[in-house]
Structures are given as C-alpha cells and as structure tokens.
C-alpha cells in the first residue's frame, strides 16, 4: 500500500472515529460524514486513475452527487431540529426516550 492510499485511509478512519466519538452535536456528525465521503471520493478517483478503469470514470461523480444529496438532507434536518428544539443535540433525536 502506497503512502497516498495510507493517508486517504487514515483520513477515512479519523472521520469515522470523529463520528463515533463526537456525536453530541448534529453539526459535528454531519462534518464527519462529509469527511468520510471526501476521503472515499479521493480514494475512488486515485484508484480509477492508477488502474486505468475506463468504464468506471463516472463512479466518483455519482458518489459526489449522493454526497451532495446527503449534505442537503442533513442540513435541512439540522435546521428543522434547531428550529423545533432550539439546539442541535443528537440526544433530542432519540425517539425511544419517554
């Protein structure tokens, strides 16, 4: 594994650890998800360019489209939750609590 792949994989793992550890605010969770999507995009692009996969050239663009949709839905959820509860704590989203 080259250093480029190792650094991209480390960025993904760091974002995943941030998502698992700092999940008190919805905004920090969304930022960690965006970091994960960005590292997946870079990993996919570098892999396609290095291996000359001509049929998979559109895959990173499709991933970016899904990441943009995920970001838009996440931000709309953030606005709705902050308007309803006045804060963006993830504990407010737990529906199993009484």
From Swiss-Prot:
It holds the Pfam family Oxidored_q2. The chain crosses the membrane at residues 1-21, 29-49, 61-81. Keywords: Electron transport, Membrane, Mitochondrion, Mitochondrion inner membrane, NAD, Respiratory chain, Translocase, Transmembrane, Transmembrane helix, Transport, Ubiquinone. InterPro entries: NADH_UbQ_OxRdtase_chain4L/K (IPR001133), NUOK/Mnh_C1-like (IPR039428). Its EC number is 7.1.1.2. One of its GO terms (molecular function) is NADH dehydrogenase (ubiquinone) activity. It comes from the Eukaryota. The keyword Electron transport applies. It is a multi-pass membrane protein. GO terms for biological process: ATP synthesis coupled electron transport. Its main location: mitochondrion. Core subunit of respiratory chain NADH dehydrogenase (Complex I) which is composed of 45 different subunits. Belongs to the complex I subunit 4L family. Core subunit of the mitochondrial membrane respiratory chain NADH dehydrogenase (Complex I) which catalyzes electron transfer from NADH through the respiratory chain, using ubiquinone as an electron acceptor. Part of the enzyme membrane arm which is embedded in the lipid bilayer and involved in proton translocation. This is NADH-ubiquinone oxidoreductase chain 4L. It comes from Monachus monachus.
């Amino acid at each position: 594994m080259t250093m480029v792949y190792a650094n991209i994989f480390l960025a993904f793992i760091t974002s995943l650890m941030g998502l698992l550890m700092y999940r008190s605010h919805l905004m920090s969770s969304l930022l960690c998800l965006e970091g994960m999507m960005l590292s997946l995009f870079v990993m996919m692009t570098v892999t396609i360019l290095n291996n000359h996969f001509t049929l998979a050239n559109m895959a990173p663009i499709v991933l970016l489209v899904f990441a943009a949709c995920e970001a838009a839905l996440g931000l709309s959820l953030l606005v709705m939750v902050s308007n309803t509860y006045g804060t963006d704590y993830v504990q407010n989203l737990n529906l199993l609590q009484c």
